[in-house]
Amino acid sequence: MIRLLLVCCALLLSACASQPPLPERNPTLALPLQLHVERQRVDQRQDWLLVIQREGAGIRWSLMDPLGIPVARQRLVDNQWQADGLLPPNPEARQLFAALLFALTPEAQLLDNYPAAQRHAALRSLAPHWQVLYRTPSDFVLTLPEQLNYHVTPLTAEAAP
C-alpha cells in the first residue's frame, strides 16, 4: 500500500515539474496580437496562425493551421491554463504559449515576472526551458528543448503563409 502511495506521489510530482513556467503576474501585453508561427524541427516545417486576445480577466490563445482549422485553444486565467472549447489537450501548444508569454513580456517587466531570466543584447533565456533570439521585438526565434524552434512574426496580409 505504501509503495502504491509513493508511486502516485512521484507521478504527481513529475506532472507538476513538467508544467512550463508562468510569470509571477500577467505582463502587460499589447493585445490583440495575430502572429505567424513557423514550427521547425530538424527538416520538418509547419505554419500556424496564432491569435492572442484579452478575455475578461484572462488571455485567450487560439492556434490554427493556415486553413483556419483549430489546432489548440487555451485560456490563461489566474496563472492557470484552462481548456477553451472541445479540443483535446495539446501539451506542445501549452509549452509554446508559455514560451511566447515569456518572449512577449516587455523588457521592463521581465525580471519581476521571471526572476531566473537572463538577458544579453538580442538574446533572452530561461534555462532550461527557452531561449529567444530577437531580430526585432516582434520577429524572433524561440528555441525549446529537443531541437524544436519556432520563428514568430506578426501576421500581415503580405506575410500570410
Language model segments and positions:
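N-terminal secretory signal peptides
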Residues: 21-78
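Mature, soluble, non-transmembrane domains
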Residues: 17-20, 36-38, 43, 49, ...
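C-terminal motif of bacterial Sec signal peptides marking the signal peptidase cleavage site
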Residues: 12-15
